UniProtKB/Swiss-Prot annotation:
Location of this chain's protein in the cell: Secreted, Cell wall
Region of interest (Heptad repeats of Y-[EQ]-X-X-L-A-X), ranges: 203-448
Secretion signal, residue range per the UniProt entry: 1-38
Protein name from the UniProt record: Major cell-surface adhesin PAc
Gene: pac
Keyword Repeat: yes
Ranges of biased composition (kind: Basic and acidic residues): 72-81
Native source organism of the sequence: Streptococcus mutans
Swiss-Prot/TrEMBL keywords: Cell wall, Dental caries, Peptidoglycan-anchor, Repeat, Secreted, Signal
Length: 1565
């Protein structure tokens, strides 16, 4: 493979996204009447367009339209039958006509059979030969008729004398019979009269009996009906009384039970009351005693307290007097001020008093109105309550009465419904029984009527058969007599040529069954009809096939042994359908059909033949024949397979062949035939010496056809070359192929020699190569075949034929037929079946019918009580309106009072000790009163039951009279037996027939490509030039003058006619074209007609026109024929040719044909398809492109079409992918490397050379930007190697996803196209997505993944321990390839940060491993990592172990985060960024920045990290709820640093500046 890369302008980012290429719109091309050829039509566009070629199922980018329907003219041309134009030839028949006329005058039945069609000859030589044959046949027919006529005249004279003698004797016998018959008739009349009188008397008695019986039955029925009616009334009343009494008793029992239960309940309640009263009394007496004791104690304590109080009161009163005087003085001054204040406030008070008065008046008015409202409201409510109480009382009474009425009605209804149900049940049973009786009567009647109808039909048939029987018997006996006479005559001639040496009648009529139906089963293989046709068109049978002759013995069966030749069931093949009009070696122009199987030695095919119309055995119809054909395992043919062509007409037999294209020495092929014949009753026919014809057993110098291993007995035909030797039937003594060779008497094929052509069914001496077998029993067999003569006898025993070698090879094949057409002469046939005397049928007995039973009367519906009327509620009175409360005036405030002076506090009076409260005296209990018991209910009085009715006894029925015994009619006299008249000589029937002979000009249509190669039923590419040649055979001598010679060709849909090229290819014709019907017409010019008519006595060669055009559809079949019309007579239709374009599944002519669909899939390095999956930047996509060529297998496109070339275009998105052209590989379907294909890469269409742009433009393809194009260096070699052989190619084109795609993320599309013969087809679009890898870095004070506090950009105190949180990029689920690298690289500032040697790694998302284990988000993953630290440079790299990464399922997402623990050791501002590496591609995180100010408590510089300064502990309080640390490990993994003295306490460190924490306080440790 050559690789070339071309540079040019890049495609615009504005005009192209990451979506894949789409196709250009192709201008539609007209399929008829268009002046411009398809390959000249191009479409250019500056924008991307889409594929429109989906109408055919093929993703075409140019000429996408589906083939339209065939025109009406084309369909009619290919299907409608028309009379064929012929020239009739008359042959003189004067002698034959005179012989027929003489025979008819003599009384011979002269039958003119249908004219025998000698066919339509095509050449003058054939015409002369056929005329000679007809003349000879007419002469023989005239001689045979004259011979029969003379014999018949002699037979008639002898017969008339014998008839006169017998008639006199029969007359005397007749007269005696008539006398006996008269006496018998008189006796019969006497007996009939006596019997009639007895019958009349009996019938009178029977009529009286029937009348008396009817009267008795009527009376009994009336009595029974009356009784049943009374009984029903009694039962209904009895049931009502019983149910009423039962209901009353049930109600009483319920009331008693309820009363008892109620009284039991009351008694129990009274007992409880008594218990509670006793308990209350005891409790009261206890409490009273306690009260009296407590009262005495309280009274004594209160007396002591009173004495103490009086002493303290005296001291208090003295001090009070002093204080009161001092306070009085101060009060006087205060009261003067108060008086002035009071005066001022008096005025205000007066005004306020008026306001109060007004308010009180308003209030009084309101309260009076309110009182009146309340009184009115109470009156209304009282009235409404009284109305409601009255309504409720009435409602209660109504409901009580309603319940009583409803219950009474329900009880009555239930009783009625029960009676109805019982009545319905009884009547249903009666109805069911009556229905059964009706059915039995109907069945009996139907059975009787059926039997009667059958009897009547049988009787009619019997009477007819009885009448026909003597006729049939006579016909049968006559035929048997005739056969016996014929056999006796044949016995005299049995040693003469053509006669059976053992004269026999042929009771098996089995000569011809053209309409038989064939079904096959086999343990071999069925063959497709298309495979058989394909085999005929090849190799040794091709020459005849091209002449429309199916030469079965030339077929090379190796062409039937391909795997795709096998069918699932039988398929018929022959000269029918598209082979109509073809000839076969089996029956010339007659239609022949056969099913084909492929067998090995010992394998069989079983054929069942039905729809037999012409076959009989002993005059009885044969309905079915079953043959089993088995390949004799002893056959010596060299190959392994045998083709059996089994004809649908069983009388034509089988063609068997193991011929592989070469003759074989010492070969043989034998087929065992096992067969059974069946009558119409499907029973096997038991043959009794039935004759089976064994014919056409040819023997040449090197080949012998024979029958062997047969059941039955061989019967030789005198003069035949066929005999029996060593159990084999064949030409035992001489050859029979050619007269004069090896003792052969005649030549088997027709030539000028007398007696030649014996090997045809209608040859008078066909017996020369035939014999017969007498068969008996139901199952018979015979093995038939052909063998090299050397297998039968030594060469020394063989006849010598000059110039021929008896050891020559031969074809191992044979056509043989086994039928009843015995070739011996004058073999009589059994055509009449021996009749059986008919048996008189027996009349059926008339049935006795059952009587139906009457139904019971329905019960009477009860009268229901009317329900009471419900009470009406009195409407409530409306309530009065409530008065509105008044709005009161507000009083004015008084002037504030003067401030009262501060008085001395009076002494506190002594406090009297309060008397203790006397205890509460207990209240005597109130005792409950016991409830009285309920009175017992009163038992009801019950109704008396009614008396049942008594039935009236039935009257006895009268005695039936006995039918008399009648006299028997005497036996009539026996019919006279007359002597049969001698059978008159049968009017012999002679048949004669005329012949039809015609000459017909032959037409043939051929379809060829531009290289003049026959492409009929093959495959050519779309846009190919296809030529139709309209050929006519030589015009025969003796024809009429040709005045017009017109060929009309309705072209197929989708075929683009080229008028100029057609005219150029058709000299001698005027060409016209009808665009509306897509039909082209050729008319011979005057000059051409002059050439045809130059000499009518000689044949003349014709010239032919050629239609030139292109096929423009994918997956289309172009069928075409033409009609020749000469002298405006009936047209002659040509054969139908057809060609198909690729892209059509289920194409019968081209089994490999299917849709043209290039495919594209994306795979990873392991060959897994990753279409639609997420791919990582830096990964390699292995695009696998299929160049779909299998549908072109056996294509026959012309050289100019092939030179359009073969290309494959890969339109890849260069924004996302980097082409690895050095790794591109092309292999064929077998895995072999493909050579002779170059690949070029162009950055855009404009950068490609004009040649490439033209190819793409004509194919309707416009890549979006960069593309690579594969092309065949030598189209012809590529076509021969891959296209014509149908071998698909596979292109693997690796492409690397560009690293920058991981920075931005996004999807990209990829599509390809193949261009074959200038036709473009688009592949599917492959879409993949690249995730954006966006690592993030935070600064945290905890190791809790749930803590989202980030102090990036804030202040960190000196000596604080904190963490860098490195959040890796997320790898989405369903990614294309395994992870093998996922690293965190942090280049920290070692001047400000000291790595403590501790880190942790956690899962950021749920991760699923290949073994199904799920690692939940937040799970620590440190154990799956390693760390590398360079403290000098301030760098740490945390790497996931590759084994762990590869254990992660590609269907799972993946993301991790690392915590690296640091200690701030310096003052200043520090920035930091980390790098996340994923599968070899690096991604930078954001930059974090933190600041550390001077420590006010310790301004010294930080010490070396190995000698840490005093640690700082920060205590903080959360604003609301306390922080809960996550459940992670409390220790970090050691990365090699030995100093781990400082470990941060998780979840308790905070900063003051950005966390809004309260109570921040630092202190020294």
């Amino acid at each position: 493979m050559k690789v070339k890369k071309t540079y040019g302008f890049r495609k615009s980012k504005i005009s192209k996204t990451l979506c894949g290429a789409v196709l250009g719109t192709v201008a539609a091309v007209s399929v008829a009447g268009q002046k411009v050829f398809a390959d000249e039509t191009t479409t250019t566009s500056d924008v991307d367009t889409k594929v429109v070629g989906t109408q055919t199922g093929n993703p075409a980018t140019n000429l996408p339209e589906a083939q339209g329907s065939a025109s009406k003219e084309a369909e009619q041309s290919q299907t409608k039958l028309e009379r064929q134009m012929v020239h009739t030839i008359e042959v003189p028949k004067t002698d034959l006509d005179q012989a027929a006329k003489d025979a008819k005058s003599a009384g011979v039945n002269v039958v003119q059979d249908a004219d025998v069609n000698k066919g339509t000859v095509k050449t003058p030589e054939e015409a002369v030969q056929k005329e000679t044959e007809i003349k000879e046949d007419y002469t023989k027919q005239a001689e045979d008729i004259k011979k029969t006529t003379d014999q018949y005249k002699s037979d008639v004279a002898a017969h008339e004398a014998e008839v006169a003698k017998i008639k006199a004797k029969n007359q005397a016998t007749k007269e005696q019979y008539e006398k006996d018959m008269a006496a018998h008739k008189a006796e019969v009349e006497r007996i009939n009269a006596a019997n009639a009188a007895s019958k009349t008397a009996y019938e009178a008695k029977l009529a009286q009996y029937q009348a008396d019986l009817a009267a008795v039955q009527k009376t009994n029925a009336a009595n029974q009906a009356a009784y049943q009616k009374a009984l029903a009334a009694y039962q209904a009343e009895l049931k009502r009384v019983q149910e009423a009494n039962a209901a009353a008793k049930a109600a009483y029992d319920t009331a008693v039970a309820a009363n008892n239960a109620k009284n039991t309940e009351i008694a129990a309640a009274n007992e409880e009351i008594r218990k509670r009263n006793a308990t209350a009394k005891a409790e009261y007496e206890t409490k009273l005693a306690q009260y009296q004791a407590e009262l005495k104690r309280v009274q004594e304590a209160n007396a002591a307290n009173e004495a103490d109080y009086q002493a303290k009161l005296t001291a208090y009163q003295t001090e009070l007097a002093r204080v009161q005087k001092a306070n009085a003085d101060a009060k006087a001054t205060y009261e003067a001020a108060v008086a002035a204040n009071n005066a001022k406030n008096a005025a205000l008070t007066a005004e306020n008093t008026a306001i109060k008065q007004r308010n009180e008046n308003a209030k009084a008015t309101y309260e009076a109105a309110l009182k009146q409202y309340e009184a009115d409201l109470a009156a209304v409510k009282k009235a409404n309550a009284a109305n409601e109480a009255d309504y409720q009382a009435k409602l209660t009474a109504y409901q009580t009465e309603l319940a009583r009425v409803q219950k009474a009605n329900a009880d009555a209804k239930a009783a009625y419904e029960a009676a109805v149900a019982a009545n319905n049940a009884a009547n249903a049973a009666l109805t069911a029984e009556n229905t059964a009786i009706k059915k039995r009567n109907a069945d009996a009647k139907a059975d009787y009527e059926a039997k009667l109808a059958k009897y009547q039909a049988d009787l009619a048939k019997y009477q007819k058969d009885l009448a026909d029987y003597p006729v049939k018997l006579k016909a049968y006996e006559d035929e048997q007599t005739s056969i016996k006479a014929a056999l006796a005559e044949l016995e005299k001639h049995k040693n003469e040529d053509g006669n059976l040496t053992e004269p026999s009648a042929q009771n098996l009529v089995y000569d011809l069954e053209p309409n038989a139906n064939l079904s096959l089963t086999t343990d071999g293989k069925f063959l497709k009809a298309s495979a058989v046709d394909d085999a005929f068109s090849k190799s040794t049978s091709k020459a005849k096939y091209d002449q429309k002759i199916l030469q079965l013995d030339d077929l090379d069966i190796t062409n039937l042994e391909q795997s795709n030749d096998v069918a699932s069931s039988m398929e018929l093949y022959g000269n029918f359908g598209d082979k109509a009009g073809w000839s076969t070696t089996v029956s010339n122009n007659s239609q022949v059909k056969w099913g084909s199987v492929l067998l090995e030695r010992g394998q069989s095919a079983t054929a069942t033949y039905t729809n037999l119309q012409n076959s009989y055995y002993n005059g009885k119809k044969i309905s079915k024949i079953v043959y089993k054909y088995t390949v004799d395992p002893k056959s010596k043919f060299q190959g392994q397979k045998v083709w059996l062509g089994i004809f649908t007409d069983p009388t034509l037999g089988v063609f068997a062949s193991a011929y592989t294209g070469q003759v074989e020495k010492n070969t043989s092929i034998f087929i065992k035939n096992e067969f059974t014949f069946y009558h119409e009753d499907e029973k096997p026919i038991n043959f009794d010496n039935a004759l089976l014809s064994v014919t056409s057993l040819n023997r040449e110098h090197n080949s012998i056809e024979m029958a062997k291993d047969y059941s039955g007995k061989f019967v030789k035909i005198s003069g035949s070359s066929i005999g029996e030797k060593n159990g084999m039937i064949y030409a035992t003594d001489t050859l029979n192929f050619k007269q004069g060779e090896g003792g052969s008497r005649w030549t088997m094929y027709k030539n000028s020699q007398a007696g030649s052509g014996w090997d045809s069914s209608d040859a008078p001496n066909s017996w020369y190569g035939a014999g017969a077998i007498k068969m008996s029993g139901p199952n018979n067999h015979v093995t038939v075949g052909a063998t090299s003569a050397t297998n039968v006898m030594p060469v020394s025993d063989m006849p010598v034929v000059p110039g021929k070698d008896n050891t020559d090879g031969k074809k191992p094949n044979i056509w043989y037929s086994l039928n009843g057409k015995i070739r011996a002469v004058n073999v009589p046939k059994v055509t009449k079946e021996k009749p059986t005397p008919p048996v008189k049928p027996t009349a059926p007995t008339k049935p006795t019918y059952e009587t139906e039973k009457p139904l019971k009367p329905a019960p009477v519906a009860p009268n229901y009580e009317k329900e009471p009327t419900p009470p009406t509620r009195t409407p409530d009175q409306a309530e009065p309106n409530k008065p509105t409360p008044p709005t009161y005036e507000t009083e004015k405030p008084l002037e504030p009072a003067p401030v009262e002076p501060s008085y001395e506090a009076e002494p506190t009076p002594p406090t009297r000790t309060p008397d203790q409260a006397e205890p509460n005296k207990p209240t005597p209990p109130t005792y409950e009163t016991e409830k009285p018991l309920e009175p017992a209910p009163v038992e009801p009085s019950y109704e008396a039951e009614p008396t049942p009715p008594t039935p009236t006894p039935d009257q006895p029925e009268p005695n039936k009279p006995v039918e008399p015994t009648y006299e028997v009619i005497p036996t009539p006299p026996t019919d006279p037996v007359y002597q049969d008249l001698p059978t008159p000589p049968s009017d012999p029937t002679v048949h004669f027939h005329y012949f039809k002979l015609a000459v017909q000009p032959q037409v043939n249509k051929e379809i060829r490509n531009n290289n003049d190669i026959n492409i009929d039923r093959t495959l050519v590419a779309k846009q190919s030039v296809v030529k139709f040649q309209l050929k006519t055979a030589d015009l025969p001598a003796g024809r009429d003058e040709t005045t017009s010679f017109v060929l009309v060709d309705p072209l197929p849909s989708g075929y683009q006619f080229n008028p100029e090229a057609t005219k150029a290819a058709s000299p001698g014709f005027d060409v016209t074209y009808d665009n509306a019907t897509n039909t082209v017409t050729f008319k011979a010019t005057a000059a051409t007609l002059a050439t045809f008519n130059a000499d009518l006595t000689k044949s003349v060669a014709t010239i032919y026109p050629t239609v030139v055009g292109q096929v423009l559809n994918d997956g289309a079949t172009y069928k075409n024929n033409f009609t020749l019309t000469v002298n405006d007579a009936y047209g002659i239709k040509s054969n139908v040719v057809r060609v198909t374009t690729p892209g059509k599944p289920n194409d019968p002519d081209n089994p490999n044909n299917n849709y043209i669909k290039p495919t594209k899939v994306n795979k990873n390095e392991n060959g897994v398809v990753i279409d639609g999956k997420t791919v990582l930047a830096g990964s390699t996509n292995y695009y696998e492109l299929t160049w779909d060529l299998d549908q072109y297998k056996n294509d026959r496109s012309s050289a100019d079409t092939i030179q359009k070339g073969f290309y494959y275009v890969d339109d890849y998105p260069e924004e996302a992918l980097e082409l690895r052209q050095d790794l591109v590989k092309i292999t064929d379907a077998n895995g072999n490397e493909v050579t002779g294909v170059s690949v070029d890469n162009y950055t855009n269409l404009e950068a490609a050379p004009q040649e490439i742009r033209d190819v793409l433009s004509k194919a309707g393809i416009r890549p979006k930007g960069a593309f690579q194009i594969f092309r065949a260096d030598n189209p012809r070699e590529f076509y021969d190697t891959y296209v014509k052989t149908g071998i698909d190619l596979k292109i693997v084109s690796p492409m690397v996803v560009k690293k920058q795609m991981g920075q931005t993320g996004g999807s990209y599309e990829n599509q390809a196209y193949q261009i074959d013969f200038g036709n473009g087809y688009a592949s599917n679009i492959v879409i993949n997505n690249v995730p954006k890898i966006n690592p993030k870095k935070d600064v945290t004070l905890t190791l809790d993944p749930a803590d989202t506090n980030n102090v990036d950009g804030q202040t960190i105190p000196l000596n604080t321990v904190f963490n860098y949180r490195l959040i890796g990029g997320i790898i989405p689920a369903n990614h294309s390839e395994e992870l093998f690298e996922y690293n965190f690289y942090d280049d920290y500032d070692q001047t400000g940060d000291h790595y403590t040697g501790q880190y942790k790694v956690f899962a950021k998302v749920d991760i699923t491993l290949k073994n199904g284990v799920i690692i939940k988000s937040g799970t620590e993953l440190t154990q799956y990592t390693t760390a590398e630290v360079d403290t000098t440079k301030g760098a740490i790299t945390i790497k996931f172990k590759e084994a762990f990464l590869r254990s992660v399922s590609i269907d799972s997402a993946f993301q991790a985060e690392s915590y690296i623990q640091m200690k701030r050791i310096a003052v200043g501002t520090f920035e930091n960024t980390y790098i996340n590496t994923v599968n070899g591609v690096t991604y930078s995180s954001n930059t974090v920045k933190t600041t550390t100010p001077e420590d006010p408590a310790d301004p010294t510089d930080p010490q070396d990290p190995s000698s840490p300064r005093t640690s700082t502990v920060i205590i903080y309080k959360p604003q609301s709820t306390a922080y809960q640390p996550s459940s992670v490990q409390e220790t970090l993994p050691n990365t090699g640093v030995t100093n781990n003295a400082y470990m941060p306490l998780l979840g308790i460190i905070g900063l003051v500046t950005s966390f809004s924490l309260l109570g921040l306080k630092a202190k020294k440790d």
